[in-house]
């Protein structure tokens, strides 16, 4: 799979998710086999460039792979300037957000709200592509709602505007993340394009990934929520794609070490206060389905210091061998 001049020999990607796919999480997913990882969404509003949140999200040092940065907005010139600005900071690929369904994004006509205005889509894509000399990609959905599934039109506009690749989530905006992702329109759209396509949505196992790739003829898969609390999913996806079977499961000790390293990295990246707060959701995703996991999560959520959070989690993980011999993994059951 080629994105401009970049060759991706492993087109299994980590989707950009605001507040989740930060530098520590991208790094761990890459270590487990993600061949592409897009940074968290950055606003195109220049007045917000120097906020603490934006500065953290703009920290690409030591990324460990191609630096793909997602920008969001609805003003063509502002988006073009944001693209130039981020390339100046080290972005090697610019990704345009046309898939976010969040109200605060759609209320300013950005994210998936853009799909309602095809002429504006063309203006934005052309402005960004012409503003930078790096590849520009686009993440989008099936459409705004079921009666307005204009993905084929948006995809053709994208290709004609010079977009290097598409990532398509198999839901409309009004679906948010409810119901099941649908892939029929993605397959139809892919058949009329000459640029690479990632398929995204509800891909939570290697078996599902193989089936969706077969159905859509997509060039790669993009994993979002399926990786939450399971970054080792990328290891299994890659092995299954190459060999047609699952690799041996990670041991409890290997999973525990991964989790603790991740939490420590968040504490170091964000600092004491923000690190503890942001780590809570990841800890929940990791342990909720494990023995006594929910109870432990509630206990950890009451803690305010990084040391207490880490030590309590470590103590819990040390008890797991007494309660189970493996990490919960639904696609390995039976």
Where are these regions (language model features)?
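Hydrophobic faces of well-ordered beta-strands that scaffold small-molecule active sites
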Residues: 12-16, 37-39, 67-71, 94, ...
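Alpha/beta enzyme core
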Residues: 31, 80-110, 118-195
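Aromatic- and acidic-residue-enriched carbohydrate-binding clefts of CAZyme catalytic domains
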Residues: 115
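Alpha/beta catalytic cores of nucleotide-metabolism and tRNA/nucleoside-modifying enzymes
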Residues: 8, 12-13, 18, 23-24, ...
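Active-site beta-loop-alpha junctions enriched in small/polar residues
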Residues: 17-19, 42-44, 72-74, 99-101, ...
